Amino acid sequence: MKIAVLVSGGGTNLQALIDAEKRGELGNGTISLVIASKPGVYALERAANNGIESKVLARKDFENIADYSRALADTMIESGIDLVVLAGFLTIIDEPVYEAFPNRILNVHPALIPSFCGKGFYGLHVHEAALEKGVKVSGATVHIVTPECDAGPIVLQKAVEVKQNDTPEDLQKRIMEEAEWKILPEAVRLFCDGKITVENNKVYIKGE
């Protein structure tokens, strides 16, 4: 299965997927395309260093979200993409992408959904909110992307301890290393090996 990874920054989750593929841990999946929402991001270098085709589709070059989403969908359809992975992709996508890839878009969110998710909860904001609330555990969630932000069916979750003296940066790093970089490749493997079905807004995993 051909995978497109959509990125907006440094691409640490992209690197986790690349490393997993090299270890044979993406099942029948192959990362075939990296799309960045802006030029010059380090994720593009990661793609180039590993021989993966990359393209830049900058949101500012399009009049509205619908046009941008149509261009995204067309680009991925032309490349024969089977699975779309949002890996730190901070640009909103719209109906053309959902319609082209129904139940075939995965996102990783740095919290245990339904906590600390939805509009405005991205990057360090998520971890700042978790620490302000005083939670004792946080973590990461991989879910299927739907039009409602962070509300799609949950594929995998992993909890991570919150330590008393954590800064947002400390918690972000721990969640990436202990959760995001583990469950994102695993969710991709499950999808590419045909283990995931969606019924009534819930994910069922076969034979695991």
For each predicted feature, which ranges?
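One-carbon transfer enzymes
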Residues: M1-E208
